[in-house]
Design a protein with these regions (language model features):
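Short, solvent-exposed loop/turn elements at beta->coil junctions and helix N-caps
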Residues: 115-123, 179-180, 219-221, 396-399
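Nucleotide donor/acceptor-binding cores
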Residues: 128, 188, 269-270
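Rossmann-like S-adenosyl-L-methionine
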Residues: 2-7, 11-17, 196-424
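Internal alpha/beta scaffold segment
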Residues: 149-181, 185, 193-217
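Terminal RNA-binding accessory module
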Residues: 1-70, 74, 146, 327
């Protein structure tokens, strides 16, 4: 019987969707962080549930051929980079398996296979946004599954300038710091949450330490420089405010959007509906290829940015609605909007049946689903499949090297059968 504190020697069989190694003891699945498929290891059980258990790695007896030495001093301590101990090319295989398993097991697409996964040539320093937390003693990241701060002076996947900013700001009574960097201009935005902090002293410290800082916010108020910075994706300039959703890896985002637009197959006769459009990144890229684009997003500030971004780039064939997709999409369809192509890029929780049902009623020729969560992608793709669409193509783009997260693009094409009453 498996029990807490029991120790075992096991061989890791595979890697789970959250990056933990999987082994089996007496028929029960055991999840062990920071292990790789093929590892022979000693583990200690830390938690036992009805159907699975959790353990920690105590010793590597025989390392897997997939292993590499992590190039990070806080690997295994902070809550990020759960796959940094695995060779990068193997990380891509793990992510392909995660997607395939979700689509087959959850979605019921038995023959599903990701045709390609696009990795990074240089999977380091790729994040344009980094969030740090602080306690009385240090600035850093939360450790896994806790609010304990792991001190950090630098992060190998974040901007190099973060080290200068952390050093300058550590003397202030801060609770949170996040930075944004424009990869096209090099400009940096610094946003600080702090109590009893002198804005002038903070500004002097940060701007003096890092000349690339062009915008500083303190507790939500712009105290230095511009209210936003700009970055360029696919030849389009985007205005980014503190609240804006903007993909964290611009290098790979361009590849992601290129793949989504390839699947969309747009021409200048087509109307596109972009659901969960954020600040209009995909919408404005699509507008260059389509007759008309309709963008939908629940966050009003993001829609303000989307409209501003359209003006900034001289794009007049994109319109935006600030309302929840589950409300505005059914309304637009009922009002007679008939998109040729629907692109949706929902948050991790996926879409919902009201939105998906409205998409089915609009009968677009193609649906391009961009997802950061294979499980909810599989669920929603099954709903759309039952409503008359088939999975035609699928590709993955690695926006998050060294983590278990991955972006997937799926093309669903209309087939002859009509949606069932459940979808309508």
């Amino acid at each position: 019987m498996i029990d807490v504190n029991n120790e075992y020697t096991v061989k890791i069989e595979s890697v789970s969707s959250d990056g933990n190694g999987i082994c089996h003891i007496d028929g029960m699945a055991v999840f062990v962080p920071y292990t790789a498929a093929g590892d022979e290891v000693k583990i200690k059980i830390t938690n036992v549930k009805k159907r699975f258990a959790e353990g920690v790695l105590t010793e590597i007896i025989m390392p897997s051929l997939d292993r590499t030495t992590p190039d990070c001093g806080i690997f295994g301590k902070c809550g990020g980079c759960s796959l940094r101990h695995i060779k990068y090319e193997k990380q891509l295989e793990v992510k392909r398996d995660i997607i395939n398993n979700a689509m087959r097991r959850i979605g019921g697409f038995k023959d599903f296979n990701v045709s390609e996964i696009i990795g990074m040539e240089n999977p380091t320093r790729y994040r344009n946004k980094t969030i740090f937390h602080a306690d009385k003693n240090s600035v850093g990241f939360y450790s896994a599954k806790s609010h304990t701060v792991v001190p950090v002076t630098d992060c190998a996947i974040g901007a190099e300038e973060n080290a200068e900013i952390i050093n300058a700001i550590s003397e202030f009574n801060m609770t949170e710091l996040f930075t944004r960097k424009s990869f096209s201009t090099g400009d940096i935005m610094v946003c600080v949450k702090a109590e009893n902090t002198d804005a002038k002293k903070l500004t002097a410290a940060v701007s003096g330490a890092c000349k690339s800082v062009k915008s500083i916010y303190l507790n939500g108020e712009n105290i230095y420089g511009s209210a936003a910075i700009t970055d360029t994706l696919c030849g389009i300039e985007f205005r980014i405010s503190p609240e804006s959703f903007f993909q964290v890896n611009p290098v790979q985002t361009e590849k992601l959007y290129a793949k989504a637009l390839e699947f969309a197959g747009l021409d200048k006769t087509m109307t596109v509906m972009d659901i969960y459009c954020g600040i209009g990144t995909i919408s404005l890229c699509a507008a260059k290829k389509a007759k008309r684009v309709i963008g939908v997003e629940i966050v009003e500030r993001a829609i303000d940015d989307a409209k501003e971004n359209a003006k900034l780039n001289g794009i007049s064939n994109a319109e935006f609605y600030a309302r929840g997709a589950e409300k505005i999409v059914p309304y637009l369809v009922k009002s007679g909007e008939v998109p040729d192509v629907v692109i949706l890029d929902p948050p991790r929780k996926g879409s919902d049946e009201k939105t998906l049902g409205a998409i089915l009623r609009s009968k677009p020729e193609r649906i391009v689903y961009v997802s950061c969560n294979p499980a909810t992608l599989a669920r929603d793709a099954r709903f759309l499949s039952d409503g008359g669409y088939t999975v035609s193509k699928a590709a993955a783009v690695d926006l998050f090297p060294h983590t278990s997260h991955v972006e997937t693009v799926v093309l669903m094409s209309k087939v002859s059968r009509e949606p069932s009453l459940l979808q309508l």
